[in-house]
Curated annotation (Swiss-Prot):
Protein name (Swiss-Prot/TrEMBL): GDSL esterase/lipase At1g20120
Short name of any one Pfam family annotated for the protein: Lipase_GDSL
SUPFAM superfamilies: SGNH hydrolase
The family this protein is said to belong to: Belongs to the 'GDSL' lipolytic enzyme family.
Signal peptide region: 1-35
Superkingdom classification of source: Eukaryota
Chain residue ranges for the region called Disordered: 41-69
Protein backbone atom coordinates (compact mmCIF):
# COMPACT_ATOMS: atom_id res chain seq x y z
CA UNK A 1 0.00 0.00 0.00
CA UNK A 2 2.79 2.43 0.94
CA UNK A 3 4.69 1.57 -2.23
CA UNK A 4 1.56 2.20 -4.34
CA UNK A 5 0.95 5.51 -2.59
CA UNK A 6 4.52 6.68 -3.10
CA UNK A 7 4.45 5.53 -6.73
CA UNK A 8 1.17 7.36 -7.35
CA UNK A 9 2.47 10.48 -5.64
CA UNK A 10 5.65 10.49 -7.71
CA UNK A 11 3.63 10.00 -10.88
CA UNK A 12 1.35 12.94 -10.05
CA UNK A 13 4.38 15.03 -9.10
CA UNK A 14 6.02 14.30 -12.47
CA UNK A 15 2.86 15.33 -14.28
CA UNK A 16 2.68 18.52 -12.23
CA UNK A 17 6.27 19.37 -13.09
CA UNK A 18 5.57 18.62 -16.75
CA UNK A 19 2.62 21.02 -16.69
CA UNK A 20 4.80 23.66 -15.03
CA UNK A 21 7.49 23.21 -17.70
CA UNK A 22 4.94 23.56 -20.48
CA UNK A 23 3.54 26.66 -18.79
CA UNK A 24 7.00 28.22 -18.65
CA UNK A 25 7.60 27.37 -22.31
CA UNK A 26 4.26 28.84 -23.41
CA UNK A 27 4.85 31.92 -21.28
CA UNK A 28 8.20 32.38 -23.03
CA UNK A 29 6.54 32.10 -26.45
CA UNK A 30 3.80 34.55 -25.49
CA UNK A 31 6.38 37.00 -24.19
CA UNK A 32 8.45 36.75 -27.39
CA UNK A 33 5.34 37.22 -29.52
CA UNK A 34 4.28 40.27 -27.53
CA UNK A 35 7.79 41.72 -27.76
CA UNK A 36 7.81 41.27 -31.52
CA UNK A 37 4.48 43.04 -31.81
CA UNK A 38 5.71 45.96 -29.75
CA UNK A 39 8.73 46.39 -31.99
CA UNK A 40 6.45 46.70 -35.01
CA UNK A 41 4.30 49.40 -33.46
CA UNK A 42 4.88 53.10 -33.00
CA UNK A 43 6.42 53.68 -29.57
CA UNK A 44 4.12 55.07 -26.90
CA UNK A 45 4.66 56.39 -23.37
CA UNK A 46 3.83 52.98 -21.90
CA UNK A 47 1.10 50.34 -21.73
CA UNK A 48 -2.24 51.44 -20.36
CA UNK A 49 -4.12 49.03 -18.14
CA UNK A 50 -7.08 47.33 -19.78
CA UNK A 51 -10.35 49.07 -18.92
CA UNK A 52 -12.67 47.43 -16.44
CA UNK A 53 -15.54 45.68 -18.20
CA UNK A 54 -18.83 47.52 -18.45
CA UNK A 55 -21.86 45.84 -16.90
CA UNK A 56 -23.54 43.58 -19.41
CA UNK A 57 -25.63 40.40 -19.55
CA UNK A 58 -23.80 37.11 -19.38
CA UNK A 59 -23.02 35.81 -22.89
CA UNK A 60 -24.02 32.58 -24.52
CA UNK A 61 -27.21 31.01 -25.77
CA UNK A 62 -27.92 29.39 -22.41
CA UNK A 63 -27.35 32.02 -19.72
CA UNK A 64 -27.85 31.11 -16.08
CA UNK A 65 -31.38 31.84 -14.88
CA UNK A 66 -31.48 35.37 -13.48
CA UNK A 67 -33.20 34.50 -10.23
CA UNK A 68 -31.17 37.04 -8.29
CA UNK A 69 -31.65 40.69 -9.18
CA UNK A 70 -29.51 43.61 -8.19
CA UNK A 71 -31.27 45.64 -5.53
CA UNK A 72 -30.83 49.16 -4.27
CA UNK A 73 -28.15 48.92 -1.62
CA UNK A 74 -28.67 50.49 1.78
CA UNK A 75 -26.62 47.99 3.76
CA UNK A 76 -23.17 47.56 2.23
CA UNK A 77 -21.17 50.63 1.23
CA UNK A 78 -18.29 48.52 -0.08
CA UNK A 79 -16.96 45.02 -0.73
CA UNK A 80 -13.48 43.68 0.02
CA UNK A 81 -12.15 40.44 -1.49
CA UNK A 82 -9.20 38.42 -0.21
CA UNK A 83 -7.67 35.08 -1.10
CA UNK A 84 -6.81 33.32 -4.34
CA UNK A 85 -7.73 33.23 -8.04
CA UNK A 86 -11.44 32.75 -7.33
CA UNK A 87 -11.62 36.43 -6.27
CA UNK A 88 -8.54 37.88 -8.01
CA UNK A 89 -9.77 40.55 -10.42
CA UNK A 90 -6.32 41.34 -11.79
CA UNK A 91 -3.78 41.89 -9.01
CA UNK A 92 -1.45 39.29 -10.49
CA UNK A 93 -1.17 41.46 -13.61
CA UNK A 94 1.02 43.82 -11.59
CA UNK A 95 3.41 41.41 -9.86
CA UNK A 96 6.21 39.18 -11.13
CA UNK A 97 4.54 35.78 -11.43
CA UNK A 98 3.63 33.20 -14.06
CA UNK A 99 0.15 32.88 -12.57
CA UNK A 100 -1.58 35.37 -14.85
CA UNK A 101 -4.73 35.61 -16.96
CA UNK A 102 -4.24 38.94 -18.71
CA UNK A 103 -4.34 37.50 -22.22
CA UNK A 104 -6.99 36.00 -24.46
CA UNK A 105 -8.99 33.81 -24.38
CA UNK A 106 -9.31 34.80 -20.70
CA UNK A 107 -11.85 37.61 -20.58
CA UNK A 108 -13.23 36.75 -24.01
CA UNK A 109 -16.80 37.41 -22.87
CA UNK A 110 -16.14 40.86 -21.48
CA UNK A 111 -17.11 43.80 -23.71
CA UNK A 112 -14.50 44.21 -26.47
CA UNK A 113 -13.01 40.86 -25.38
CA UNK A 114 -10.67 42.58 -22.93
CA UNK A 115 -8.74 40.25 -20.57
CA UNK A 116 -8.45 41.97 -17.18
CA UNK A 117 -6.59 39.30 -15.23
CA UNK A 118 -9.63 37.37 -14.04
CA UNK A 119 -9.11 33.61 -14.27
CA UNK A 120 -12.29 33.08 -16.25
CA UNK A 121 -13.98 33.86 -19.56
CA UNK A 122 -15.98 36.62 -17.86
CA UNK A 123 -17.06 37.76 -14.41
CA UNK A 124 -15.99 36.00 -11.22
CA UNK A 125 -17.69 35.70 -7.79
CA UNK A 126 -16.36 38.98 -6.39
CA UNK A 127 -18.04 40.78 -9.31
CA UNK A 128 -21.33 38.90 -9.10
CA UNK A 129 -21.65 39.27 -5.34
CA UNK A 130 -20.88 43.00 -5.48
CA UNK A 131 -23.49 43.42 -8.20
CA UNK A 132 -26.17 41.36 -6.48
CA UNK A 133 -25.90 43.21 -3.17
CA UNK A 134 -26.01 46.56 -4.95
CA UNK A 135 -22.46 47.82 -4.48
CA UNK A 136 -21.23 47.95 -8.11
CA UNK A 137 -21.16 45.76 -11.24
CA UNK A 138 -17.47 44.81 -11.06
CA UNK A 139 -14.75 44.94 -8.41
CA UNK A 140 -11.37 46.38 -9.45
CA UNK A 141 -8.01 44.98 -8.37
CA UNK A 142 -6.32 47.04 -5.67
CA UNK A 143 -2.99 47.10 -7.52
CA UNK A 144 -4.58 48.38 -10.71
CA UNK A 145 -3.14 51.81 -11.64
CA UNK A 146 -5.47 54.77 -11.96
CA UNK A 147 -8.20 53.74 -9.53
CA UNK A 148 -10.60 56.60 -8.86
CA UNK A 149 -11.80 57.73 -5.46
CA UNK A 150 -15.17 56.11 -6.18
CA UNK A 151 -13.42 52.84 -7.10
CA UNK A 152 -11.69 52.79 -3.74
CA UNK A 153 -14.59 53.95 -1.60
CA UNK A 154 -16.83 51.13 -2.84
CA UNK A 155 -14.21 48.42 -2.37
CA UNK A 156 -11.53 46.48 -4.20
CA UNK A 157 -10.06 43.00 -4.46
CA UNK A 158 -6.78 42.20 -2.72
CA UNK A 159 -6.87 38.54 -3.78
CA UNK A 160 -4.04 36.93 -5.73
CA UNK A 161 -4.17 33.81 -7.88
CA UNK A 162 -2.05 31.08 -6.29
CA UNK A 163 -2.22 32.37 -2.72
CA UNK A 164 -3.32 30.41 0.32
CA UNK A 165 -3.48 30.11 4.10
CA UNK A 166 -0.14 28.28 4.18
CA UNK A 167 2.59 30.97 3.84
CA UNK A 168 4.57 28.55 1.66
CA UNK A 169 1.82 28.35 -0.98
CA UNK A 170 2.22 31.86 -2.46
CA UNK A 171 6.01 31.66 -2.25
CA UNK A 172 6.10 28.70 -4.63
CA UNK A 173 4.26 30.59 -7.40
CA UNK A 174 5.21 34.17 -6.45
CA UNK A 175 1.65 35.17 -5.55
CA UNK A 176 0.66 37.81 -2.98
CA UNK A 177 0.66 36.22 0.50
CA UNK A 178 -2.38 36.63 2.72
CA UNK A 179 -0.23 38.66 5.10
CA UNK A 180 0.63 41.10 2.30
CA UNK A 181 -3.03 41.30 1.30
CA UNK A 182 -3.76 42.38 4.85
CA UNK A 183 -1.01 45.00 4.63
CA UNK A 184 -2.59 46.31 1.44
CA UNK A 185 -5.96 46.42 3.21
CA UNK A 186 -4.51 48.54 6.00
CA UNK A 187 -2.87 50.78 3.42
CA UNK A 188 -6.23 51.03 1.67
CA UNK A 189 -7.93 52.10 4.90
CA UNK A 190 -5.50 55.00 5.26
CA UNK A 191 -6.29 56.09 1.71
CA UNK A 192 -10.01 56.04 2.46
CA UNK A 193 -9.44 58.10 5.61
CA UNK A 194 -7.64 60.63 3.44
CA UNK A 195 -10.67 60.84 1.15
CA UNK A 196 -13.55 61.01 3.63
CA UNK A 197 -12.10 61.34 7.11
CA UNK A 198 -11.65 58.85 9.96
CA UNK A 199 -15.30 58.52 11.02
CA UNK A 200 -16.69 57.93 7.53
CA UNK A 201 -13.82 55.56 6.70
CA UNK A 202 -14.53 53.46 9.77
CA UNK A 203 -18.18 53.27 8.73
CA UNK A 204 -17.22 52.03 5.25
CA UNK A 205 -14.89 49.37 6.65
CA UNK A 206 -17.24 48.17 9.39
CA UNK A 207 -20.32 48.05 7.17
CA UNK A 208 -18.56 46.76 4.07
CA UNK A 209 -18.66 43.06 3.20
CA UNK A 210 -15.32 41.24 3.46
CA UNK A 211 -15.17 37.92 1.58
CA UNK A 212 -12.28 35.45 1.83
CA UNK A 213 -11.70 32.46 -0.46
CA UNK A 214 -8.54 30.36 -0.10
CA UNK A 215 -7.35 26.85 0.70
CA UNK A 216 -7.64 25.12 -2.67
CA UNK A 217 -4.05 25.87 -3.65
CA UNK A 218 -2.78 24.81 -0.23
CA UNK A 219 -4.30 21.36 -0.64
CA UNK A 220 -4.08 20.76 -4.39
CA UNK A 221 -0.65 22.27 -4.97
CA UNK A 222 1.42 22.71 -1.83
CA UNK A 223 0.36 19.54 0.00
CA UNK A 224 -0.61 17.02 -2.67
CA UNK A 225 0.87 18.58 -5.82
CA UNK A 226 4.49 19.23 -4.94
CA UNK A 227 4.38 17.33 -1.63
CA UNK A 228 6.11 20.28 0.05
CA UNK A 229 4.27 19.76 3.34
CA UNK A 230 3.20 16.12 3.04
CA UNK A 231 6.46 14.86 4.51
CA UNK A 232 6.10 17.13 7.55
CA UNK A 233 2.38 16.79 8.32
CA UNK A 234 -0.35 14.24 7.91
CA UNK A 235 -3.50 15.68 6.34
CA UNK A 236 -5.27 16.00 9.69
CA UNK A 237 -2.47 18.13 11.12
CA UNK A 238 -2.10 20.17 7.94
CA UNK A 239 -5.79 21.06 7.70
CA UNK A 240 -5.72 22.09 11.37
CA UNK A 241 -2.79 24.37 10.55
CA UNK A 242 -4.74 25.84 7.61
CA UNK A 243 -7.82 26.47 9.75
CA UNK A 244 -5.71 28.12 12.44
CA UNK A 245 -4.10 30.37 9.83
CA UNK A 246 -7.53 31.30 8.46
CA UNK A 247 -8.79 32.15 11.96
CA UNK A 248 -5.74 34.33 12.52
CA UNK A 249 -6.49 36.17 9.28
CA UNK A 250 -10.09 36.68 10.40
CA UNK A 251 -8.92 38.17 13.68
CA UNK A 252 -6.61 40.58 11.87
CA UNK A 253 -9.46 41.69 9.61
CA UNK A 254 -11.55 42.30 12.72
CA UNK A 255 -8.77 44.26 14.39
CA UNK A 256 -8.48 46.36 11.23
CA UNK A 257 -12.13 47.35 11.58
CA UNK A 258 -14.02 44.81 9.45
CA UNK A 259 -17.29 43.70 11.07
CA UNK A 260 -18.97 41.67 8.31
CA UNK A 261 -16.67 38.82 7.34
CA UNK A 262 -17.45 35.70 5.34
CA UNK A 263 -15.07 32.80 4.71
CA UNK A 264 -16.03 30.58 1.79
CA UNK A 265 -14.84 26.99 2.13
CA UNK A 266 -13.03 24.79 -0.35
CA UNK A 267 -14.96 23.15 -3.20
CA UNK A 268 -14.62 19.47 -4.28
CA UNK A 269 -11.15 20.13 -5.73
CA UNK A 270 -10.68 16.45 -6.49
CA UNK A 271 -13.25 16.83 -9.26
CA UNK A 272 -11.70 19.75 -11.13
CA UNK A 273 -10.42 18.69 -14.57
CA UNK A 274 -6.69 18.88 -13.85
CA UNK A 275 -7.04 16.65 -10.77
CA UNK A 276 -9.13 14.15 -12.72
CA UNK A 277 -6.35 14.07 -15.31
CA UNK A 278 -3.42 13.73 -12.93
CA UNK A 279 -5.04 11.64 -10.17
CA UNK A 280 -8.20 10.08 -11.57
CA UNK A 281 -6.71 7.21 -13.53
CA UNK A 282 -7.69 6.23 -17.07
CA UNK A 283 -11.36 6.92 -16.38
CA UNK A 284 -10.52 10.38 -14.96
CA UNK A 285 -12.61 9.91 -11.84
CA UNK A 286 -12.70 12.46 -9.04
CA UNK A 287 -9.70 12.27 -6.71
CA UNK A 288 -11.35 11.16 -3.47
CA UNK A 289 -8.26 11.94 -1.41
CA UNK A 290 -8.46 15.64 -2.29
CA UNK A 291 -12.21 15.81 -1.74
CA UNK A 292 -11.78 14.24 1.69
CA UNK A 293 -9.09 16.81 2.52
CA UNK A 294 -11.36 19.64 1.39
CA UNK A 295 -14.21 18.42 3.61
CA UNK A 296 -11.85 17.92 6.54
CA UNK A 297 -10.55 21.47 6.21
CA UNK A 298 -14.05 22.91 5.79
CA UNK A 299 -15.21 21.23 8.98
CA UNK A 300 -12.27 22.63 10.94
CA UNK A 301 -12.63 26.08 9.38
CA UNK A 302 -16.30 26.19 10.34
CA UNK A 303 -15.55 25.18 13.92
CA UNK A 304 -12.66 27.64 14.27
CA UNK A 305 -14.68 30.57 12.94
CA UNK A 306 -17.70 29.76 15.10
CA UNK A 307 -15.52 29.78 18.21
CA UNK A 308 -13.73 32.95 17.17
CA UNK A 309 -17.00 34.74 16.43
CA UNK A 310 -17.97 34.43 20.10
CA UNK A 311 -15.07 36.70 21.03
CA UNK A 312 -15.90 39.46 18.52
CA UNK A 313 -18.20 42.32 19.49
CA UNK A 314 -20.86 43.57 17.07
CA UNK A 315 -19.39 41.41 14.31
CA UNK A 316 -20.75 38.86 11.88
CA UNK A 317 -18.14 36.19 11.13
CA UNK A 318 -19.49 33.19 9.25
CA UNK A 319 -18.36 30.11 7.40
CA UNK A 320 -20.00 29.69 3.99
CA UNK A 321 -20.31 26.20 2.53
CA UNK A 322 -19.53 26.03 -1.19
CA UNK A 323 -18.76 22.31 -1.27
CA UNK A 324 -22.39 21.18 -1.32
CA UNK A 325 -23.52 23.54 -4.09
CA UNK A 326 -20.45 22.82 -6.20
CA UNK A 327 -20.84 19.08 -5.75
CA UNK A 328 -24.52 19.23 -6.69
CA UNK A 329 -23.57 20.90 -9.96
CA UNK A 330 -21.09 18.11 -10.66
CA UNK A 331 -23.48 15.31 -9.72
CA UNK A 332 -26.52 16.83 -11.46
CA UNK A 333 -25.17 18.85 -14.40
CA UNK A 334 -28.38 18.74 -16.45
CA UNK A 335 -30.23 20.41 -13.59
CA UNK A 336 -28.06 23.47 -14.23
CA UNK A 337 -27.86 23.19 -18.01
CA UNK A 338 -24.30 21.83 -18.23
CA UNK A 339 -23.20 19.18 -20.72
CA UNK A 340 -19.52 19.02 -19.70
CA UNK A 341 -18.32 18.85 -16.11
CA UNK A 342 -15.04 16.92 -16.34
CA UNK A 343 -13.00 19.07 -18.73
CA UNK A 344 -12.50 22.76 -19.39
CA UNK A 345 -13.59 24.75 -22.42
CA UNK A 346 -10.05 25.89 -23.24
CA UNK A 347 -7.96 23.51 -25.35
CA UNK A 348 -8.34 19.84 -24.51
CA UNK A 349 -9.71 20.93 -21.14
CA UNK A 350 -7.55 18.34 -19.41
CA UNK A 351 -4.47 20.32 -18.32
CA UNK A 352 -4.67 23.81 -19.82
CA UNK A 353 -4.27 26.56 -17.22
CA UNK A 354 -2.73 30.03 -17.29
CA UNK A 355 -0.17 30.32 -20.13
CA UNK A 356 -1.23 26.94 -21.50
CA UNK A 357 -4.66 28.42 -22.18
CA UNK A 358 -3.86 31.00 -24.84
CA UNK A 359 -5.21 32.14 -28.20
CA UNK A 360 -2.20 30.82 -30.12
CA UNK A 361 -2.18 27.16 -29.10
CA UNK A 362 -5.60 26.48 -27.56
CA UNK A 363 -8.82 25.85 -29.43
CA UNK A 364 -12.02 26.67 -27.57
CA UNK A 365 -15.21 24.71 -27.09
CA UNK A 366 -18.13 25.71 -29.31
CA UNK A 367 -20.53 26.56 -26.50
CA UNK A 368 -18.87 27.83 -23.33
CA UNK A 369 -22.19 28.15 -21.50
CA UNK A 370 -22.59 24.36 -21.59
CA UNK A 371 -19.26 23.88 -19.76
CA UNK A 372 -18.91 24.05 -16.00
CA UNK A 373 -15.17 24.72 -16.23
CA UNK A 374 -13.36 27.35 -18.27
CA UNK A 375 -9.82 25.99 -17.96
CA UNK A 376 -8.63 22.89 -16.13
CA UNK A 377 -8.89 24.63 -12.76
CA UNK A 378 -11.45 27.45 -12.83
CA UNK A 379 -15.22 27.45 -13.45
CA UNK A 380 -16.85 29.38 -16.28
CA UNK A 381 -18.61 32.69 -15.78
CA UNK A 382 -21.94 30.90 -15.94
CA UNK A 383 -20.95 28.42 -13.22
CA UNK A 384 -19.67 31.27 -11.06
CA UNK A 385 -22.94 33.12 -11.59
CA UNK A 386 -24.99 30.17 -10.36
CA UNK A 387 -22.75 29.69 -7.30
CA UNK A 388 -22.86 33.41 -6.51
CA UNK A 389 -26.65 33.43 -6.76
CA UNK A 390 -26.84 30.56 -4.30
CA UNK A 391 -24.54 32.41 -1.93
CA UNK A 392 -26.55 35.64 -2.03
CA UNK A 393 -29.88 33.83 -1.69
CA UNK A 394 -28.88 31.36 1.03
CA UNK A 395 -25.98 32.80 3.03
CA UNK A 396 -26.32 36.59 3.14
CA UNK A 397 -28.93 36.71 5.91
CA UNK A 398 -26.55 37.09 8.89
CA UNK A 399 -24.81 40.05 7.24
CA UNK A 400 -28.06 41.98 6.97
CA UNK A 401 -28.83 41.38 10.64
CA UNK A 402 -25.68 43.12 11.86
Amino acid sequence: MLQDRVSGSLSSSKISRCVLFLSLFCFFLLTMHASANRLQRVPNPGPSPAPEPKPCPSPGPNPAPATTKRTHNTTFPAIFAFGDSILDTGNNDYILTLIKANFLPYGMNFPDKVPTGRFCNGKIPSDFIADYIGVKPVVPAYLRPGLTQEDLLTGVSFASGGSGYDPLTPIVVSAIPMSKQLTYFQEYIEKVKGFVGKEKAEHIISKGLAIVVAGSDDLANTYYGEHLEEFLYDIDTYTSFMASSAASFAMQLYESGAKKIGFIGVSPIGCIPIQRTTRGGLKRKCADELNFAAQLFNSKLSTSLNELAKTMKNTTLVYIDIYSSFNDMIQNPKKYGFDEIDRGCCGTGLLELGPLCNKYTSLLCKNVSSFMFWDSYHPTERAYKILSQKFVENDMGPFYDN
